[in-house]
Amino acid sequence: MPVQPPSKDTEEMEAEGDSAAEMNGEEEESEEERSGSQTESEEESSEMDDEDYERRRSECVSEMLDLEKQFSELKEKLFRERLSQLRLRLEEVGAERAPEYTEPLGGLQRSLKIRIQVAGIYKGFCLDVIRNKYECELQGAKQHLESEKLLLYDTLQGELQERIQRLEEDRQSLDLSSEWWDDKLHARGSSRSWDSLPPSKRKKAPLVSGPYIVYMLQEIDILEDWTAIKKARAAVSPQKRKSDGP
């Protein structure tokens, strides 16, 4: 059999195999180079990281100090501003110009006016009550005075009438006793001239109709008893009047 020449496909496959082997070798070399460069870069980066860390730390510390200084300055400035504002508001309050003072003050003044009006109305009512009470007390006092005056007048009138009655009774008793004594004396003096009088001028004995009481007492005793009875009646009559009264 004749020998056939190799086909193009086989040649291409061999060429691809050679190129793949070459590429694998190159890749291995590149990986070794990269690993070496990485180690070198890591060493360099570690040295750079320490320096960068120190540099950044110093920068951060300086920035922090700067910020603290700015904060303290701002705080002091804010304190001064707030203090000046408070002083200004205090001056406005002292001059009665601050709104936070004038608005409540207006409310207080309005409430003061209302309370003054209410107090005036209450005062008027209280004065009316006191005036009415005074008039009632005055009227009651006048009525009490009038009643006491009438009672005193009645009492004095009764006492005076009793005294007058007693005086009248005493006067009558004295008149009777004096008449009796006069009659006695006249009877003793004129007993002798009785017979000498004419019959026309002699007193006739009184005619008594009905029962005739013969007193066994003497005339002086009868007169004393009659006077005692009159005085007893006069003493009993005011007591009876007081018991019958209101």
UniProtKB/Swiss-Prot annotation:
Localization terms from the record: Nucleus; Cytoplasm
Q: Which gene encodes it?
A: BRMS1
Q: Does the keyword Transcription regulation apply?
A: yes
GO BP, one example?
negative regulation of NF-kappaB transcription factor activity
Q: What does this protein do?
A: Transcriptional repressor. Down-regulates transcription activation by NF-kappa-B by promoting the deacetylation of RELA at 'Lys-310'. Promotes HDAC1 binding to promoter regions. Down-regulates expression of anti-apoptotic genes that are controlled by NF-kappa-B. Promotes apoptosis in cells that have inadequate adherence to a substrate, a process called anoikis, and may thereby inhibit metastasis. May be a mediator of metastasis suppression in breast carcinoma.
- Compositional bias (Acidic residues): 11-32, 40-52
Q: How does it assemble?
A: Homohexamer (Potential). Interacts with SNX6, HDAC1 and RELA. Interacts with ARID4A. Identified in mSin3A corepressor complexes together with SIN3A, SIN3B, RBBP4, RBBP7, SAP30, SUDS3, ARID4A, HDAC1 and HDAC2. Interacts with SPOP; this recruits the protein to a ubiquitin ligase complex containing SPOP and CUL3.
**Assigned protein family:** Belongs to the BRMS1 family.
Q: How is it modified after translation?
A: Ubiquitinated by a cullin-RING-based BCR (BTB-CUL3-RBX1) E3 ubiquitin-protein ligase complex containing SPOP, leading to proteasomal degradation.
Where on this protein does the Glycyl lysine isopeptide (Lys-Gly) (interchain with G-Cter in SUMO2) crosslink form?
A: K184, K242
**What Pfam families has UniProt attached to this entry?**
Sds3 (PF08598)
Q: Which residues form a coiled coil?
A: 51-98
- This protein's name: Breast cancer metastasis-suppressor 1
Give the record's GO CC terms: cytoplasm; nucleoplasm; nucleus; Sin3-type complex
- Extract the GO molecular function terms from the UniProt entry: histone deacetylase binding; NF-kappaB binding
The UniProt keyword set, sorted, is: Apoptosis, Coiled coil, Cytoplasm, Isopeptide bond, Nucleus, Repressor, Transcription, Transcription regulation, Tumor suppressor, Ubl conjugation
Source organism (scientific name): Homo sapiens (Human)
